[in-house]
Amino acid sequence: MPADEIDEKILNYLKKQQWPATSEDVAKAINVQWHTAQIHLMKLMAEEKVKFRRVGRQNQWWLNKIYDKHMK
């Protein structure tokens, strides 16, 4: 699957979520390996398209607008 397609699938998945999704949740939803999802999520974070928060052992991800709505 091309990288742009993975990014688009991740963003579409996160748009549907009202609460944070873990890297594992994202990977399962778009049918890729955990580390593939993690790499793309980190890239999207660097592009300021998603926000990241570590809670215990989980990496949690939101779209920026959903994060701002719940965390401010």
Task: Give residue ranges: language-model regions.
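Short, cationic-aromatic polyanion-contact patches
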Residues: 1-7, 22, 54-72
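A short acidic, leucine-rich amphipathic alpha-helix
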Residues: 25-27
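Key DNA-contact positions within bacterial/archaeal DNA-binding proteins
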Residues: 35
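A short, conserved structural fragment
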Residues: 45-55
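Short, hydrophobic-biased segments on the C-terminal half of alpha helices
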Residues: 41-42
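Short amphipathic alpha-helical interface segments
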Residues: 6-19
